Amino acid sequence: MQDLLFEYKRTLKQTRIQYKPLAEADESVLSAEELKDKKIIRNMITDLEYVTEWLEKGRQPGIRRAIDRRDVYQRLMIKDPRIIESFSSAMMFEPDGQVSEEDRDRIREALALLTDREKEMFLLHKVECFSYERIADLLGVKKSTVQTTIKRASLKMQRQQEEMNRSLA
């Protein structure tokens, strides 16, 4: 792959050398054939630049948000509800290490408020004790996105708890 990239870059350099005298010359001095050559060489340079950028970056040039990067925001690492359930049961411990059924129901209700994305990040941070940075690396997002999402999830659950407390009072 590197050999191919090297060859393309070398060809691009040679093509630019060929194009330079045609680009510097006044168009009124150039013959019809030289004008055609100038246009063809300019197109060749554009194509070579496109290919070298594609080979270097591994994705189509010019796309601001490539599909492989867009997919990061739709992907979930934890998809099995049983795994999420096992995390939720381990969230709060009573002194003897057992979580009461009432607490489990409260945890389930709190987690039900969250989107899959929020739930995933929240559980990785609070249950698995992953750092924001590690979660960001795992999910392919920025650290600030993880922080904001976890903060939003905590606020949602806190509001629900406050509403439940008000309704009980």
UniProtKB/Swiss-Prot annotation:
Residues 132-157 bind DNA. GO terms for biological process: DNA-templated transcription initiation. Gene3D superfamilies: Winged helix-like DNA-binding domain superfamily/Winged helix DNA-binding domain. InterPro entries: RNA_pol_sigma-70_dom, RNA_pol_sigma70_r4_t2, RNA_pol_sigma_r3/r4-like, WH-like_DNA-bd_sf. Keywords: Activator, DNA-binding, Transcription, Transcription regulation. It comes from the Bacteria. One of its GO terms (molecular function) is DNA binding. Positive regulatory protein that acts at the late promoter PL. This is Positive control factor. It comes from Bacillus subtilis (strain 168). The gene is xpf.
